[in-house]
């Protein structure tokens, strides 16, 4: 493997944050400097965490996942007052979801290792599985290549309901059939059987979406020391109830903090991305087997548009009696992470970084500082045949990331032709239109009744001109078919559906192509945190 860095233009909050724009950086409590991380350590030492209870739960959970010894040692280390975490999270996508989930894990492993060395304290990597999430459309699919197109392949649940991913049962047999269909779209390699068995071993141990995700991530990162936590685990929820009570007691301040911070974001010229109901208390409650967002209504906490109503006292009582019924939303999830873990740094993608900029005052209302927010590593893999295509077309490795591939293709094609086709035909159409306008005026003057026919005559001439143009372009494309197919392959591999590779392709494709140690070999590369995009030639 060979790694290169390229500067890819970013937009909005992420671009300004990485470029050191003070206005947006003021929406975060720590900069990304070594002094800021030292200050964060100092601030965390002023707080108390329920470390021993957390260690007991994480040991049990990660042991059930058959995590490696390095993971269990890291969990035990969390019991020490001088151990901290680097954390990131994601929904429990089938087959781990898009590549960026894998890249988030690589990011926390990398940063935890670096900060442990530079700060001289124990730093462990934690991945927070958003098990409470009930949006199955976000996690029930992957993309595959079919008939020279990227196709979204959905796993259809036989019994869909608005339950969390931790509680949504997974039909092992149906999922196995779905996975086999996906692997049929991959080339048969020396690794295919091993990878299928690897995935199936994880599936056989799983009852839910979160189970499958957690077993697969544990196996992929078996020797890394990665700690997994299911945010909707009932045992974890018991530990979180004191903070749920705090959120409920301060829900008005949380609402106001969000509104005020979003106003700050608007004044800085950005568009807020968190959209919630104005009366939301930012906590979900399980009602009739569904996650229901609680809202404030005349001093009561209601769900399902008032169909269910609770007083403050009733809600607190229910939290103590049935903790597992409650879960966080997009606003309170970061707060709960901060409550549970001594977080040295949070790692997020571009969207997460933008929405965290809207939470600063929310953190402050519950007495927390927002942890340092570090943009995750972004990575694209370039296979050997794609590198050859780039070379053959005399394209730089950075070109597909800095330009639209369709535009690159059009520019290349126009350079192969001495005179631009579009310009010639546009000129011809204009000249014909001018001549025909004069001709129509003459016809109407001699015989007004033929005016409509003359207009149709012009349309037919234009249709023939356009047909000629299409046929010429088709013949030119056929002449350069080999080269144009190279552009299609480049787009398919590096910018599928016009999006970054890591937002579409799944890690199983690369495990199938390069073996089960693919991710381990990726992690051997040197990565930097300067905001540049990492291109890895395979």
From Swiss-Prot:
EC number: 6.-.-.-
The keyword Transit peptide is annotated on this UniProt entry: no
Keyword Ligase: yes
GO molecular function terms listed in the Swiss-Prot or TrEMBL record: ligase activity
Coiled-coil spans in chain: 248-268
Keywords, sorted A to Z: Coiled coil, Ligase
Superkingdom field: Bacteria
Family in the record: Belongs to the BshC family.
Function in brief: Involved in bacillithiol (BSH) biosynthesis. May catalyze the last step of the pathway, the addition of cysteine to glucosamine malate (GlcN-Mal) to generate BSH.
Protein name, per record: Putative cysteine ligase BshC
Organism of origin: Bacillus cereus (strain ATCC 14579 / DSM 31 / CCUG 7414 / JCM 2152 / NBRC 15305 / NCIMB 9373 / NCTC 2599 / NRRL B-3711)
């Amino acid at each position: 493997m060979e790694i290169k860095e390229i500067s890819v233009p970013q937009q909005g909050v992420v671009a300004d944050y990485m470029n050191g724009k003070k206005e947006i950086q003021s929406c975060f409590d720590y900069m990304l400097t070594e002094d800021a991380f030292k200050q964060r350590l100092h601030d965390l030492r002023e707080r108390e965490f329920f470390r021993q209870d957390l260690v007991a739960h994480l040991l049990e959970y990660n042991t059930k996942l058959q995590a490696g010894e390095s993971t269990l040692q890291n969990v035990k280390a969390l019991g020490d007052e001088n151990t901290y975490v680097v954390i990131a999270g994601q929904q429990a996508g089938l087959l781990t979801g898009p590549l960026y989930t894998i890249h988030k894990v690589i990011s926390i492993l990398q940063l935890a290792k670096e900060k442990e060395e530079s700060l001289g304290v124990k730093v462990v990597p934690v991945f927070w599985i958003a098990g409470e999430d009930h949006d199955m459309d976000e996690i029930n699919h992957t993309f595959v290549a079919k008939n020279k197109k990227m196709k979204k392949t959905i796993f259809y649940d036989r019994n869909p309901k608005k339950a969390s991913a931790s509680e949504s049962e997974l039909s092992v047999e149906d999922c196995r059939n779905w996975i086999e269909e996906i692997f049929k779209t991959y080339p048969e390699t020396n690794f295919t059987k091993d990878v299928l068995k690897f995935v199936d071993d994880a599936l056989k141990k799983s009852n839910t979406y979160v189970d499958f995700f957690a077993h697969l991530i544990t196996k992929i990162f078996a020797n890394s020391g990665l700690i997994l936590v299911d945010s909707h685990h009932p045992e974890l929820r018991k530990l979180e109830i004191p903070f749920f009570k705090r959120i409920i007691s301060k829900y008005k301040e949380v609402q106001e903090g969000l509104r005020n911070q979003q106003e700050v974001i608007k004044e800085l010229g950005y568009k807020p991305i968190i959209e919630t109901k104005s009366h939301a208390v930012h906590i979900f409650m399980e009602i009739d087997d569904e996650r229901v967002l609680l809202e404030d209504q005349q001093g009561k906490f209601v769900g399902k548009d008032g169909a269910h109503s609770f007083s403050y006292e009733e809600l607190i009582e229910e939290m103590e009696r049935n903790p597992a019924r409650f879960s966080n939303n997009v606003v309170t999830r970061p707060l709960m992470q901060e409550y549970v873990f001594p977080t040295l740094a949070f790692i997020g993608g571009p969207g997460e970084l933008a929405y965290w900029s809207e939470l600063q005052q929310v953190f402050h209302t519950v007495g927390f500082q927002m942890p340092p927010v570090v943009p995750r590593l972004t990575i694209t893999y370039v296979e050997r045949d794609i590198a050859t295509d780039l070379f053959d077309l005399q394209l730089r490795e950075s070109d597909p990331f800095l330009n639209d591939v369709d535009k690159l293709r059009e520019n290349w094609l126009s350079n192969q032709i001495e005179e631009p086709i579009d310009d010639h035909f546009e000129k011809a159409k204009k000249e014909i239109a001018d001549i025909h306008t004069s001709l129509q005026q003459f016809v109407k003057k001699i015989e007004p009744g033929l005016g409509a026919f003359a207009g149709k005559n012009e349309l037919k001439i234009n249709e023939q001109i356009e047909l000629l143009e299409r046929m010429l372009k088709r013949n030119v494309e056929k002449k350069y078919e080999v080269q144009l197919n190279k552009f299609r392959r480049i787009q398919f591999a590096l910018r599928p559906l016009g999006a970054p590779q890591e937002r579409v392709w799944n890690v199983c494709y690369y495990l199938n192509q390069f073996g089960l140690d693919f991710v381990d070999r990726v992690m051997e590369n040197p990565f930097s945190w300067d905001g540049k995009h990492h291109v890895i030639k395979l």
